Structures are given as structure tokens and as C-alpha cells.
Amino acid sequence: MKNICILGATGSIGTQTLDVIEKESNKFKLVAFSANKSYEKIITIIEKFNPVYGAINDKETFLKVKDHCNINNIKINLLYGMDGLIKISTLEEVELVVTSIVGMIGLVPTLEAINAGKDIALANKETLVTGGELVMKAAKQNNVKILPVDSEHGAIFQCLQGNSYKDIETIYVTASGGPFRQSKLEELINITPEQALKHPKWNMGKKISIDSSTMINKGLEVIEAHWLFNVGYDKIKVLVHPQSIVHSMVEYIDGSIIAQLASTDMRLPIQYALNYPVRNKKVVEKLDVYNMGNLTFEKPDFEKFRGLKLAYEAGKLGGIMPTIFNASNEVAVNMFLNNHIKYLEIVDIVEECMNKFENKSIKDVEDILNAEAKVRSFIKNKYNF
């Protein structure tokens, strides 16, 4: 029985991780989880999985859940805020921490978990995008496995099994192209949040859905792949694949290309990460290779999707520039979802911040958090958000 902690248990990845744990309850036990404001989901998790610990980031929700547990005589150790996140991430009994929490808030507890010797099933892109150098160094020092949960990185990870990283010629990170793959740039001027949230293939949370529509999500994945697989940016290419059946490919120096194909269900890469290094019987509908139809591939449009181009620039510059890229995008996406800016202004704001702030090297987590705070403050003050 493997003891699991999920950071961000009520979100899209967290919910699907719980589904895998439920289906394989003879192998996994939810010992601890974190959540923010989703009261009903939190209560369901507590009553269904009987975890020992729960960390809640929103004060009002924390008090409400605490009252419910006291009234109903439910035994659980409830914790609040960042201290709670760190506590559950470093529990002695926890063996694997699933970091599915969205945003920069996941960086510190993930690092703390690594320093406590916990293996990580990583679904929080921001952790590697902003702190990749610190995270991978800590993982090496503590002999910790970083197991990718993203479908693309999970696919790359599988394609690399039994092969040497030094033999990699090119990593192809596939992308569906999002809802606006066939749209012209001028057609994107008046895009609404509702339109941008309609992803053609994946069922995801709001933030990642908007990021997918701008292809900034793919840019974040490129930076993530750089750190996960220790590969230069010149060897990481984005390949638009509208059918979303090939989840990524690795080309080797001898010309061989290994690809991972599967149905579009996040529970598959989650299951692989939880069970690694073994495989278990499927928890998802298998891919019908006889009826999957034609598979097409095309180059991304870097002019229409400038966010992808900026991601490569930020990644190559290194230092705190990926943090500036990520933080500005987080705030801009939130502004767009609240109808405070237009769709194309998301990338404009990201570019503005990358040009405004000086790049610096990273010595510790504080450098990352300070850079993020400055970017957020600048945008909110300038755009009255």
C-alpha cells in the first residue's frame, strides 16, 4: 500500500487522481490532501477517503470544514494555509506527493517535500518553470524521483525508458493547437472567455484551458521538458497534432522515433506515475487503433501564437525570466477571465513584463518569490486590477 498526499485535490488533476486511487484502493491510500475553496468537494473527499490530514488554504472554508467535522465527529487533522501545505507534504508516512495544485503556490511545498525525501508526481508546471534549477538539484541531492503527470511529459518519460538521454536528437512535444488553431489572428481580437475555454480535446481547469488556447501552456511545457530531461531548447520542438492521440515523441541520434499513443484521458499518465516503475490494468478506455483515423502533424504558427515564442525566449534566457513570463501570464489570464482585458492583451502583458524587468540569476526560492511579487504588483497597479 502506497501512502499518497495530493496537493490540489479538488482541481481537475486532483479529482482524476482521486478516481485512480479509488479504482486501485488495494494499492493506494490517501493520507493527506490540500484544497482551497471547494467546500462540497472537500467534504466528499474527507467522508469518502478518510484521510488523516487536510490542509485548506482559504480561511473561511477552513473554518466551515472544521465546524462540519466537529459536528459530525469526523476525525481528521485540519491545517490552514502555507504552513499546512508544507506540513502535509513532509509527513513521515507519505511516500508520494502529487503536486496538482495550480500556480506558484505549489513551488515551496514541492521543494519541502523533495528535501524531506518524498517522490513527486508532478502536475504543477510552475514548479519547474520558475524553480527548475533548484528543484532538480534538490531532487538529485535527496535521491528523489520526479515523475511527470502531464500527458506530454509522461509520454516523453515513457519513450525514454531503456534509452540514454545523451542519445536524444529531438523531443517533440505535441499540441492539439487549441480552439483557435485554424483561426486567423484578426479573428482573435474579440474572443470571449467562454470561447477560449472550449478546448477541442481535453477537459481541463480554466487557467490551463486559456493557456492552451494561447499556446502559452505548450511554452510552459517546453521549459518543463528542458528541466525534466536535461535537454537544450534547440532539441525541444513543438508539433501540432490536432487528433491528440500521439502525446509526444522522442527522436534518437540513429534516426529512430519512439512515440506514445493513448486515449485523451489524464487518468492514464496519473496511473503510470502512481504505479511507476510497474504498470497496472487500465482504468481508462483503451485506444482503438483500428478506428483512430488519420494522424496529422504541422508546425506551430509562432506569429499567431506569440506566447509560445516568448516561452522559448524566457527559457533560453534562464534566471528569473521564466518566473516573469509565468507570473505575468497568471495575472493576465485572471484579468481576461474577469473581462478586465481583451484576449490578445494576455500575451501583450507578458511581453511587456519580459521587456521591463531585468533578468537575474536565482540563488534561492526568495529570488523567485520576490520576482513574482514585483511582476504581480506592477500589472495590478498599471491595469487597476
Swiss-Prot record:
- Keyword Transferase belongs to the record: no
Q: Where does NADPH bind?
A: T10, G11, S12, I13, K37, N124, E126, G205
- Signal peptide (from-to): none
Q: Which reaction does it catalyse?
A: 2-C-methyl-D-erythritol 4-phosphate + NADP(+) = 1-deoxy-D-xylulose 5-phosphate + NADPH + H(+)
Q: Which InterPro entries match?
A: DXP_reductoisomerase, DXP_reductoisomerase_C, DXP_reductoisomerase_N, DXPR_C, DXPR_C_sf, NAD(P)-bd_dom_sf
* Keywords assigned by UniProt, alphabetized: Isoprene biosynthesis, Manganese, Metal-binding, NADP, Oxidoreductase
Q: What is this protein called?
A: 1-deoxy-D-xylulose 5-phosphate reductoisomerase
Q: What does the UniProt function comment say about this protein?
A: Catalyzes the NADPH-dependent rearrangement and reduction of 1-deoxy-D-xylulose-5-phosphate (DXP) to 2-C-methyl-D-erythritol 4-phosphate (MEP).
Q: Which organism is it from?
A: Clostridium novyi (strain NT)
Which GO biological-process labels does this protein carry?
isopentenyl diphosphate biosynthetic process, methylerythritol 4-phosphate pathway involved in terpenoid biosynthetic process
Residues recorded as binding 1-deoxy-D-xylulose 5-phosphate, renumbered to this chain, are K125, S151, E152, S176, H199, S212, N217, K218, E221
Q: Which family does it belong to?
A: Belongs to the DXR family.
Which amino acids does the record list as binding Mn(2+)? Answer: D150, E152, E221
Disulfide bridge map: none
Instruction: Tell me what gene encodes this.
Output: dxr
Q: Which cofactor does it need?
A: Mg(2+); Mn(2+)
Name the pathway it acts in: Isoprenoid biosynthesis; isopentenyl diphosphate biosynthesis via DXP pathway; isopentenyl diphosphate from 1-deoxy-D-xylulose 5-phosphate: step 1/6
**Which E.C. number(s) belong to this protein?**
1.1.1.267
MF (Gene Ontology): 1-deoxy-D-xylulose-5-phosphate reductoisomerase activity; manganese ion binding; NADPH binding
Transmembrane ranges, per UniProt, are none
Q: Which enzyme class, named as a word? A: oxidoreductase
Q: Does the keyword Secreted apply?
A: no
